Design a protein with these regions (language model features):
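Short secondary-structure boundary/capping segments
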Residues: 3, 17, 68, 85-86, ...
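Catalytic core of membrane glycerolipid acyltransferases/transacylases, capturing the structured
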Residues: 21-84, 89-90, 100-115
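Helix-to-loop junction immediately C-terminal to a conserved catalytic motif
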Residues: 1-31
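Non-catalytic C-terminal accessory region of glycerolipid acyltransferases
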Residues: 86-225
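A generic secondary-structure signal marking the coil-to-beta-strand transition
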Residues: 9, 23-25, 37, 51, ...
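Hydrophobic alpha-helical segments of integral membrane proteins
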Residues: 1-4, 67-70, 156
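Short, well-ordered coil/turn elements that cap or connect secondary structure elements
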Residues: 6-8, 48-50, 128
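Short gly/ser/thr-rich secondary-structure transition/capping motifs
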Residues: 6-13, 75-79, 166-167
């Protein structure tokens, strides 16, 4: 399936040289509604670098049998500080989407917005393990679907933490639009030696990563030039 989607969207990754050839790194990924752009990126990393790449996913994913099997087969583990710390301490590449479901459910009026304001656990994890943070974003993924702002989506997320989007893709269907997808990998944000997990340090690094993601989201696919 991912091979089909890769060809359908002419998916490409720019900036793979920013991923270290060895040692731990935390890849902070912007979250789209479609989500599979992140899977395409993960498989590209494995294919092009030969490195093990593991992502952390929302616990809700693992409550649905079919989705659980797909997530597990794609190297996704339930999100927890323990899982993240173990992988980084073992020297692996770790992928996280700090915005989570909340960011994925953004209406199209908030395309390319970064909703990480209160999501700082990934920064603490990087500080605790010394792993660099690498920003990753696929701007055009926000154009695969038109997502409508509505009370049902907000209520389902607020009360039950369930994704109930109202969206459409190609025409009036849920088939994703044949948009070219380019994932951009930014330069690593290195945690300073001796950095401690205190609010000031966390806020400083968090602001750096957020600004880097926003810059990547402003990039335009040069193949459309």
């Amino acid at each position: 399936m991912l091979g089909v989607l890769r060809r359908y969207h002419a998916h490409d990754v720019l900036g793979l040289e920013n991923i270290p050839k060895s040692g731990p790194a935390l890849l902070a990924v912007h979250h789209s509604l479609a989500t599979y752009d992140a899977f395409l990126f993960g498989h590209a990393v494995i294919r092009e670098t030969g490195r093990t790449f593991t992502g952390l996913g929302d616990d809700k994913l693992f409550a649905v049998p079919g989705v659980r099997r797909f997530a597990s087969a794609s190297g996704i583990l339930p999100a927890s500080p323990e899982n993240g710390r173990k992988l980084l301490n073992e020297g692996h590449l770790l992928g996280v989407a700090p915005g989570g479901m909340r960011e994925a459910l953004r209406p199209s009026s908030e395309r390319k917005h970064v909703l990480w304001d209160k999501r700082k656990g990934f920064v603490r994890l990087a500080i605790q393990t010394g792993a660099p943070i690498i920003p990753v974003a696929c701007p055009s993924a926000d154009f695969l679907y038109t997502v409508y702002e509505n009370r049902l989506t907000k209520l389902a997320y607020k009360k039950l933490k369930l994704p109930v989007p109202v969206a459409r893709g190609f025409g009036l269907t849920l088939v994703p639009r044949p948009v070219r997808l380019t994932t951009y990998v930014g330069e690593a944000i290195v945690i300073p030696d001796g950095a401690i997990d205190d609010p000031e340090t966390v806020d400083t690094v968090h602001a750096q990563v957020t600004a880097a993601i926003e810059a990547l989201l402003d990039r335009r696919d040069t193949r459309d030039s």
